[in-house]
Amino acid sequence: MRHLSSLHRHGIPVLAPLVLLVACSSGGAGTPSAGTPDASAAAGPSADTASPSRVLDADPARLPRDREAALDLIGRVIADPDSFGPGVVRRSPYESGPATWPVLGADCAWHQEKPAGNVLATLTRSFEVPAAQGKGPVRLSAVVTVHRTREDARWEMAESIEETMRCPTQQLQEGERIGSMVSAALLGGESGQTTSEDALSESGQYSSTALGGPHAYVWQQAQSLRFTVAATGKGAEGRTEEEISDLVVQGMATMLVRIESAVEKQS
């Protein structure tokens, strides 16, 4: 995979591919890959081979205990345009309402719904690298979610893996689809994975009525304590997978560093 070298440059380890499923559809899209929540644990290293997982040493007094505090923390750690690098601007609408978050329905389409009861707060922001010099626009997004417990955050990660198995292709928004995915997962402490307790990555193909396709698609998600962060990059004509991945990795690295700074114990 061409984008993997960029992960090392930002201190995020390469994720070992779990499954590659390629399926045909009328739209030419392929199949994301994954496993069930129970299988996600089995896919990780065994107790005999795994390195100790790095867990952020947080100050309990700095962890949010209610929705107001969670929203305040999210506002301090979620990516802004500069988090992805130069040339990135806000898209409109810039932020989703904190009263909704994306849910993959039985129809394999993403919908905005009320957050689950185990979510203290969540926020999504949208960005873009404008079209220039014969290259189409790159559409980016960032999500930060604060769960009530660490276990709730870990279940969100497991459910993300299950979703890619359940839906051969996915509709992101009206006229947008993804497929032909390579999925990977890595637990904290495995293969140098020290930026979070758990990390997921997908890359594949993105098509839309507005931008055509297929183009490069990259998604990453990570979990640390009660927090999950995710970033998505959707390519366009003239944009390489490596270019999209570099943007996503930079945004993820920024958010993970900000979370650590916001909640870690201070000497």
Mark where each language-model region is:
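A small/polar (G/S/T-enriched), proline-flanked helix-loop surface module common
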Residues: 52, 56-60, 88-217, 251, ...
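A short acidic/glycine-rich loop-to-helix N-cap element
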Residues: 233-250
